[in-house]
């Protein structure tokens, strides 16, 4: 039987994944897959999720929001793991899943992953960090990191807007140097965004 590694963030999106695990396992089993879970938390390094990875694994299923997807992507690149990923959008915002028009129904999402073939997508790199959705610097860019998890889980997307308004009260520019193959920019700005999707 083929294996699938699911790396999931139990705190994403009002902890919605916790109530969906049985449906995820049941759906994969009905297609002849063995699902091997890895629960993300502060105590377990994310690299440990891939200790047992071998050719028996068909793909990596990432369950969480944009931050979880970025974390797993960076570890996979660091460890030179070249396996297809499936995204189960169970986070608060899920901007990248929205950009790809991925289904949010768990069963539909899994069946979509199983019944489709892998497709290549671009990923970006800033300094030594990869990103799949957006790279940002300046005002509002650390809003999601500053939000209390319980507040975010209870308020959902609204929590980002509330924190953003709070941050706007301390608006100030910063000096930046951007160097790419096409352009070099040195100057002041309030916010810089590099999109791989449609929103951030």
State what each model feature region is:
Residues 7, 31, 38-40, 78-194:
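Catalytic core of DAGKc-family lipid kinases
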Residues 12, 69, 92:
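Short, glycine/acidic-enriched loop or turn micro-motifs at the edges of active sites
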Residues 15, 72, 95-97:
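Generic hydrophobic alpha-helical membrane-span motif
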Residues 64-65, 136:
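Helix N-cap/beta->alpha junction signal
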Residues 198-200:
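Short, intrinsically disordered, charge-balanced linker/junction segments flanking boundaries
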């Amino acid at each position: 039987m083929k294996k699938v590694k699911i790396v999931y963030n139990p705190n994403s999106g009002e902890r919605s994944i916790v109530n969906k695990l049985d449906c995820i396992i049941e759906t994969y089993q009905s297609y002849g897959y063995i699902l091997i879970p890895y629960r993300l938390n502060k105590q377990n390094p994310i690299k440990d999720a891939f200790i047992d990875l071998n050719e028996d694994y068909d793909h990596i299923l990432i369950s969480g929001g944009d931050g979880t997807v970025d974390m797993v992507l960076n570890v996979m690149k660091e460890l030179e793991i070249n396996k297809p990923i499936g995204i189960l959008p169970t986070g608060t915002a899920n901007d990248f899943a929205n950009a790809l028009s991925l289904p949010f129904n768990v069963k539909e999402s899994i069946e979509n992953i199983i019944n489709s073939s892998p497709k290549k997508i671009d990923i970006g790199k800033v300094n030594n960090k990869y990103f799949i959705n957006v790279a940002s610097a300046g005002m509002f860019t650390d809003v999601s990191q500053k939000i209390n998890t319980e507040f975010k889980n209870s308020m959902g997307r609204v929590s980002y807007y509330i924190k953003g308004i709070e941050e706007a009260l301390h608006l100030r520019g910063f000096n930046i140097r951007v160097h790419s193959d096409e352009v070099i920019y040195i100057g002041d700005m309030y916010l810089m965004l590099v999109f791989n999707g449609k929103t951030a």
